[in-house]
């Protein structure tokens, strides 16, 4: 079995590779332009990557934090992707585990995400509850999923 390690992007080269991977996996298949893989919360978010022995990125995930209901902190996982040839090896599960651990460390009450229809079973197996169908900016079926952390 190949060897992987997990980290946060640190160098300019890693950040560039991170955003390129994100676009290739999550935006290009929908015909979206380079640049659509970023949003206004990048600097505030906690980013994780999975790398091969030669430091190629094969998995990514991000979590950012929101204040809701006056002081209650909520977390949203976004931009989860694992290269097709590495799916089923536990990489996505480990990325989500690390993101949720960061949320717990910050005392977050709940964590949510918008999952593509084909990913709902994956997130349910990790403890997320399916809430409702939602409209996504990609015009592709997505579902609101939530996990209570307290």
Predicted regions and their residues:
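Active-site rim helix/loop that mediates acceptor-substrate recognition in acyltransferases
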Residues: 20-53, 57
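Conserved beta-strand in the GNAT
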Residues: 49, 56-66, 74-81
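Conserved N-terminal entry element of GNAT/NAT acetyltransferase domains
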Residues: 1-13
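Acidic/histidine-enriched, beta-strand-rich ligand/metal-binding domains
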Residues: 78, 85-87, 122-125
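Conserved catalytic-core motifs of GNAT/GCN5-like acyltransferases
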Residues: 112-114, 124, 129-144
